[in-house]
Amino acid sequence: MDRIDFRSDTVSWPTPDMREAMAHAQVGDDVYGEDPTVNALEARAAAKTGKEAALFVSSGTMSNLIAILSHATRGDEAIVGDAYHTYCWEAGGMATLGGVVPHPLPVDQTGRMALADIEGAVRGDDPH
């Protein structure tokens, strides 16, 4: 599969055809699942990534918080790469908004953490 760059909307610009499509897009209330454009986008993203479903959100920061908070709750710790966007550039959102404490680990040039580092960082249940 080709690499899909989801870094930010700031690294891409809409083409004239994209702007034209936006001007003529059908719209509806996406809160109630009534926006055909959002529904089609979510279906397309799910199909492209081989997933059962997809969720459109307004920013990468929001998507990162949703991912973290779907797996952790206040007081939990999240193991993250020390160069990851969610750790370096999101204003401490996981801690500030979610109460989840980041546990940063070093990453290599490809952005990967070493398995041994991850295994060493996992903490057992704390009765305190």
Segments predicted by a language model, with ranges:
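Short, flexible, glycine-rich and Lys/Arg-enriched loop motifs at helix boundaries
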Residues: 85-86, 90-96, 122-128
